[in-house]
From Swiss-Prot:
Keyword check for Isomerase: no
Protein name: Xyloglucan endotransglucosylase/hydrolase protein 31
Native source species: Arabidopsis thaliana
Gene Ontology MF term list: polysaccharide binding; xyloglucan-specific endo-beta-1,4-glucanase activity; xyloglucan:xyloglucosyl transferase activity
Other information: In contrast to group 1 and group 2 endotransglucosylase/hydrolase proteins, it may not contain the ligase activity, and may catalyze endohydrolysis xyloglucan polymers only.
Gene Ontology CC terms: apoplast; plasma membrane
Its EC number(s): 2.4.1.207, 3.2.1.151
Stimuli inducing this protein: Up-regulated by gibberellins. Not induced by auxin. Down-regulated by aluminum.
Length: 293
Protein backbone atom coordinates (compact mmCIF):
# COMPACT_ATOMS: atom_id res chain seq x y z
CA UNK A 1 0.00 0.00 0.00
CA UNK A 2 2.80 2.44 0.92
CA UNK A 3 4.56 1.81 -2.41
CA UNK A 4 1.31 2.37 -4.28
CA UNK A 5 0.78 5.69 -2.55
CA UNK A 6 4.33 6.77 -3.36
CA UNK A 7 3.84 5.81 -7.03
CA UNK A 8 0.60 7.80 -7.25
CA UNK A 9 2.27 10.81 -5.65
CA UNK A 10 5.05 10.68 -8.23
CA UNK A 11 2.52 10.62 -11.05
CA UNK A 12 0.89 13.76 -9.68
CA UNK A 13 4.14 15.59 -9.02
CA UNK A 14 5.95 14.48 -12.16
CA UNK A 15 3.48 14.28 -15.06
CA UNK A 16 4.66 12.72 -18.26
CA UNK A 17 6.31 14.89 -20.88
CA UNK A 18 5.10 15.24 -24.45
CA UNK A 19 1.93 17.26 -24.78
CA UNK A 20 2.06 18.72 -21.28
CA UNK A 21 5.18 20.88 -21.11
CA UNK A 22 4.86 24.55 -20.31
CA UNK A 23 6.82 26.94 -22.46
CA UNK A 24 9.02 29.62 -20.89
CA UNK A 25 7.65 33.15 -21.03
CA UNK A 26 9.00 35.06 -24.03
CA UNK A 27 8.40 38.31 -22.13
CA UNK A 28 6.85 40.00 -25.16
CA UNK A 29 3.59 39.05 -26.87
CA UNK A 30 3.25 40.40 -30.42
CA UNK A 31 -0.25 38.97 -30.83
CA UNK A 32 -1.51 41.26 -28.06
CA UNK A 33 -0.46 44.28 -30.13
CA UNK A 34 -2.61 43.31 -33.13
CA UNK A 35 -6.43 43.50 -33.03
CA UNK A 36 -8.56 40.60 -34.20
CA UNK A 37 -10.07 41.03 -37.67
CA UNK A 38 -13.40 39.56 -38.83
CA UNK A 39 -12.89 36.92 -41.51
CA UNK A 40 -15.23 38.57 -44.02
CA UNK A 41 -13.40 41.88 -43.75
CA UNK A 42 -9.99 40.41 -44.56
CA UNK A 43 -10.50 37.20 -46.57
CA UNK A 44 -12.46 35.55 -49.35
CA UNK A 45 -13.00 31.89 -50.14
CA UNK A 46 -10.47 30.80 -52.74
CA UNK A 47 -11.66 27.26 -53.45
CA UNK A 48 -13.84 24.53 -51.97
CA UNK A 49 -16.62 26.84 -50.79
CA UNK A 50 -18.82 23.80 -50.14
CA UNK A 51 -16.16 22.61 -47.68
CA UNK A 52 -16.10 25.79 -45.63
CA UNK A 53 -18.43 26.88 -42.85
CA UNK A 54 -18.54 30.02 -40.72
CA UNK A 55 -20.15 30.00 -37.30
CA UNK A 56 -19.77 33.15 -35.23
CA UNK A 57 -16.01 33.77 -35.12
CA UNK A 58 -14.89 30.26 -36.20
CA UNK A 59 -14.14 29.28 -39.80
CA UNK A 60 -14.18 25.52 -40.38
CA UNK A 61 -12.50 23.91 -43.39
CA UNK A 62 -12.67 20.24 -44.23
CA UNK A 63 -11.18 17.77 -46.65
CA UNK A 64 -12.89 14.69 -48.03
CA UNK A 65 -12.28 12.55 -51.08
CA UNK A 66 -13.82 15.16 -53.37
CA UNK A 67 -11.85 18.27 -52.35
CA UNK A 68 -10.46 20.44 -49.59
CA UNK A 69 -10.83 24.18 -49.08
CA UNK A 70 -8.86 27.38 -48.90
CA UNK A 71 -9.12 31.13 -48.37
CA UNK A 72 -7.06 34.16 -49.37
CA UNK A 73 -6.67 37.69 -48.03
CA UNK A 74 -8.31 40.50 -49.95
CA UNK A 75 -5.12 42.56 -49.97
CA UNK A 76 -1.43 41.84 -50.61
CA UNK A 77 1.16 42.88 -48.03
CA UNK A 78 4.82 43.69 -48.31
CA UNK A 79 5.41 43.15 -44.58
CA UNK A 80 3.42 42.56 -41.41
CA UNK A 81 2.14 40.27 -38.68
CA UNK A 82 -0.17 37.47 -39.84
CA UNK A 83 -1.68 35.03 -37.37
CA UNK A 84 -4.66 32.85 -36.51
CA UNK A 85 -5.73 30.50 -33.76
CA UNK A 86 -6.08 26.98 -35.16
CA UNK A 87 -7.43 23.70 -33.83
CA UNK A 88 -6.54 20.45 -35.57
CA UNK A 89 -8.32 17.12 -35.90
CA UNK A 90 -7.22 14.18 -33.72
CA UNK A 91 -6.87 10.57 -34.82
CA UNK A 92 -5.74 9.40 -38.25
CA UNK A 93 -4.81 12.46 -40.31
CA UNK A 94 -1.86 11.13 -42.32
CA UNK A 95 -1.37 12.84 -45.66
CA UNK A 96 -3.38 15.92 -44.66
CA UNK A 97 -1.81 19.39 -44.79
CA UNK A 98 -3.45 22.19 -42.78
CA UNK A 99 -1.78 25.53 -43.41
CA UNK A 100 -1.45 29.24 -42.79
CA UNK A 101 0.96 30.88 -45.21
CA UNK A 102 2.03 33.86 -47.31
CA UNK A 103 2.41 33.54 -51.07
CA UNK A 104 2.34 35.33 -54.40
CA UNK A 105 2.09 32.17 -56.51
CA UNK A 106 -0.96 33.38 -58.43
CA UNK A 107 0.79 36.62 -59.37
CA UNK A 108 4.20 35.10 -60.11
CA UNK A 109 3.61 31.58 -61.45
CA UNK A 110 6.90 29.81 -61.96
CA UNK A 111 9.00 31.94 -59.59
CA UNK A 112 6.84 32.80 -56.60
CA UNK A 113 7.76 33.55 -52.99
CA UNK A 114 6.18 31.74 -50.04
CA UNK A 115 6.42 31.59 -46.24
CA UNK A 116 4.67 28.59 -44.68
CA UNK A 117 3.28 27.27 -41.46
CA UNK A 118 2.02 23.76 -42.21
CA UNK A 119 0.63 21.09 -39.93
CA UNK A 120 1.45 17.67 -41.33
CA UNK A 121 -1.02 14.94 -40.45
CA UNK A 122 -0.11 11.84 -38.53
CA UNK A 123 -1.30 8.50 -37.21
CA UNK A 124 -2.80 7.81 -33.76
CA UNK A 125 -0.21 7.97 -31.00
CA UNK A 126 2.24 10.11 -32.98
CA UNK A 127 2.41 13.91 -32.78
CA UNK A 128 1.67 16.37 -35.55
CA UNK A 129 4.65 17.98 -37.24
CA UNK A 130 4.62 21.75 -37.62
CA UNK A 131 6.66 22.57 -40.70
CA UNK A 132 7.96 26.06 -41.37
CA UNK A 133 9.32 26.87 -44.80
CA UNK A 134 10.60 29.77 -46.88
CA UNK A 135 10.65 29.82 -50.68
CA UNK A 136 12.28 32.62 -52.64
CA UNK A 137 11.41 32.71 -56.33
CA UNK A 138 10.61 29.02 -56.17
CA UNK A 139 7.86 27.44 -58.21
CA UNK A 140 7.31 23.95 -56.87
CA UNK A 141 9.13 22.58 -59.90
CA UNK A 142 12.48 20.81 -59.80
CA UNK A 143 14.30 24.09 -59.25
CA UNK A 144 12.50 24.92 -56.03
CA UNK A 145 14.69 25.37 -52.96
CA UNK A 146 12.83 24.67 -49.74
CA UNK A 147 14.10 25.84 -46.37
CA UNK A 148 12.18 23.48 -44.12
CA UNK A 149 12.40 23.31 -40.35
CA UNK A 150 10.04 20.87 -38.63
CA UNK A 151 8.91 20.85 -35.01
CA UNK A 152 6.73 18.84 -32.73
CA UNK A 153 4.79 20.86 -30.15
CA UNK A 154 4.79 21.10 -26.36
CA UNK A 155 1.01 20.66 -26.28
CA UNK A 156 -1.65 18.67 -28.11
CA UNK A 157 -2.87 20.93 -30.96
CA UNK A 158 -6.08 18.90 -31.29
CA UNK A 159 -7.36 19.70 -27.80
CA UNK A 160 -7.77 23.46 -28.09
CA UNK A 161 -7.03 26.49 -30.23
CA UNK A 162 -3.46 27.80 -30.23
CA UNK A 163 -2.13 30.90 -31.95
CA UNK A 164 0.33 30.57 -34.83
CA UNK A 165 1.84 33.54 -36.62
CA UNK A 166 4.36 34.77 -39.16
CA UNK A 167 6.00 38.17 -38.69
CA UNK A 168 7.68 39.34 -41.87
CA UNK A 169 9.55 42.62 -42.02
CA UNK A 170 12.30 43.94 -44.32
CA UNK A 171 15.01 42.40 -42.13
CA UNK A 172 13.74 39.04 -40.95
CA UNK A 173 10.93 36.51 -40.71
CA UNK A 174 9.90 35.17 -37.30
CA UNK A 175 7.61 32.19 -36.74
CA UNK A 176 5.60 32.19 -33.49
CA UNK A 177 3.59 29.58 -31.58
CA UNK A 178 1.52 31.16 -28.80
CA UNK A 179 3.93 34.13 -29.01
CA UNK A 180 6.96 31.88 -28.44
CA UNK A 181 9.40 32.45 -31.32
CA UNK A 182 10.42 29.08 -32.75
CA UNK A 183 12.39 30.17 -35.81
CA UNK A 184 13.97 33.25 -37.33
CA UNK A 185 15.03 33.66 -40.94
CA UNK A 186 17.23 36.70 -41.43
CA UNK A 187 17.79 38.76 -44.55
CA UNK A 188 21.42 38.18 -45.46
CA UNK A 189 20.96 39.30 -49.05
CA UNK A 190 18.03 40.04 -51.33
CA UNK A 191 18.54 36.91 -53.44
CA UNK A 192 17.51 34.64 -50.56
CA UNK A 193 14.85 36.78 -48.90
CA UNK A 194 11.27 37.42 -50.09
CA UNK A 195 10.68 41.10 -50.85
CA UNK A 196 7.71 41.12 -53.24
CA UNK A 197 4.16 41.56 -51.89
CA UNK A 198 2.36 38.42 -50.75
CA UNK A 199 -1.19 37.47 -49.81
CA UNK A 200 -2.25 35.53 -46.70
CA UNK A 201 -3.74 32.07 -47.23
CA UNK A 202 -5.21 29.23 -45.23
CA UNK A 203 -6.09 25.77 -46.53
CA UNK A 204 -6.59 22.08 -45.94
CA UNK A 205 -5.60 19.68 -48.72
CA UNK A 206 -4.31 16.21 -49.57
CA UNK A 207 -0.50 16.19 -49.50
CA UNK A 208 -0.17 12.40 -49.43
CA UNK A 209 2.81 12.46 -51.79
CA UNK A 210 5.10 13.86 -49.09
CA UNK A 211 3.41 15.01 -45.87
CA UNK A 212 3.62 11.96 -43.58
CA UNK A 213 6.85 9.95 -43.35
CA UNK A 214 7.93 11.33 -46.75
CA UNK A 215 4.76 10.07 -48.39
CA UNK A 216 4.91 6.53 -47.07
CA UNK A 217 1.53 6.86 -45.31
CA UNK A 218 -1.26 8.29 -47.45
CA UNK A 219 -4.55 9.96 -46.57
CA UNK A 220 -7.16 7.31 -45.71
CA UNK A 221 -10.62 8.55 -46.57
CA UNK A 222 -12.28 6.02 -44.35
CA UNK A 223 -11.57 8.68 -41.69
CA UNK A 224 -13.05 11.62 -43.62
CA UNK A 225 -13.91 14.39 -43.24
CA UNK A 226 -10.63 15.88 -42.01
CA UNK A 227 -11.44 19.14 -40.24
CA UNK A 228 -9.47 22.26 -39.31
CA UNK A 229 -10.86 25.23 -37.40
CA UNK A 230 -9.55 28.80 -37.57
CA UNK A 231 -10.41 31.88 -35.53
CA UNK A 232 -8.87 35.01 -34.01
CA UNK A 233 -7.42 36.24 -37.30
CA UNK A 234 -4.77 38.94 -36.86
CA UNK A 235 -3.43 40.83 -39.85
CA UNK A 236 -1.48 44.07 -39.50
CA UNK A 237 1.24 45.59 -41.58
CA UNK A 238 2.08 47.38 -44.77
CA UNK A 239 -0.06 46.60 -47.80
CA UNK A 240 1.41 46.69 -51.27
CA UNK A 241 0.13 50.23 -51.78
CA UNK A 242 1.11 51.61 -48.35
CA UNK A 243 3.44 54.60 -48.28
CA UNK A 244 7.17 54.07 -47.88
CA UNK A 245 6.93 55.40 -44.32
CA UNK A 246 4.77 52.43 -43.23
CA UNK A 247 6.31 50.28 -40.50
CA UNK A 248 5.09 46.75 -39.69
CA UNK A 249 4.55 45.54 -36.11
CA UNK A 250 7.74 44.74 -34.26
CA UNK A 251 8.57 41.15 -33.26
CA UNK A 252 10.29 42.39 -30.11
CA UNK A 253 10.08 45.12 -27.45
CA UNK A 254 12.81 47.22 -29.05
CA UNK A 255 12.14 47.92 -32.71
CA UNK A 256 15.04 47.22 -35.09
CA UNK A 257 17.10 45.45 -32.41
CA UNK A 258 16.02 41.86 -33.04
CA UNK A 259 14.52 39.52 -30.50
CA UNK A 260 15.07 40.27 -26.84
CA UNK A 261 17.29 38.12 -24.64
CA UNK A 262 14.19 36.55 -23.07
CA UNK A 263 12.70 35.80 -26.49
CA UNK A 264 15.97 34.24 -27.63
CA UNK A 265 15.97 32.03 -24.53
CA UNK A 266 12.44 30.87 -25.40
CA UNK A 267 13.49 30.22 -29.01
CA UNK A 268 16.49 28.21 -27.84
CA UNK A 269 14.22 26.16 -25.58
CA UNK A 270 11.82 25.44 -28.45
CA UNK A 271 14.56 24.40 -30.85
CA UNK A 272 16.47 22.35 -28.30
CA UNK A 273 13.41 20.35 -27.27
CA UNK A 274 11.11 20.25 -30.31
CA UNK A 275 13.08 20.81 -33.52
CA UNK A 276 13.12 17.51 -35.43
CA UNK A 277 14.42 18.58 -38.86
CA UNK A 278 16.62 21.43 -40.05
CA UNK A 279 17.41 21.71 -43.75
CA UNK A 280 20.77 23.29 -42.91
CA UNK A 281 21.83 20.10 -41.14
CA UNK A 282 20.64 17.69 -43.84
CA UNK A 283 23.70 16.06 -45.47
CA UNK A 284 21.61 15.14 -48.52
CA UNK A 285 20.96 18.79 -49.39
CA UNK A 286 23.08 20.85 -51.78
CA UNK A 287 24.07 23.68 -49.47
CA UNK A 288 25.61 25.74 -52.25
CA UNK A 289 21.97 26.67 -52.94
CA UNK A 290 21.32 27.71 -49.34
CA UNK A 291 24.19 30.09 -48.47
CA UNK A 292 22.35 31.24 -45.33
CA UNK A 293 23.28 27.89 -43.76
Amino acid sequence: MALSLIFLALLVLCPSSGHSQRSPSPGYYPSSRVPTSPFDREFRTLWGSQHQRREQDVVTLWLDKSTGSGFKSLRPYRSGYFGASIKLQPGFTAGVDTSLYLSNNQEHPGDHDEVDIEFLGTTPGKPYSLQTNVFVRGSGDRNVIGREMKFTLWFDPTQDFHHYAILWNPNQIVFFVDDVPIRTYNRKNEAIFPTRPMWVYGSIWDASDWATENGRIKADYRYQPFVAKYKNFKLAGCTADSSSSCRPPSPAPMRNRGLSRQQMAALTWAQRNFLVYNYCHDPKRDHTQTPEC
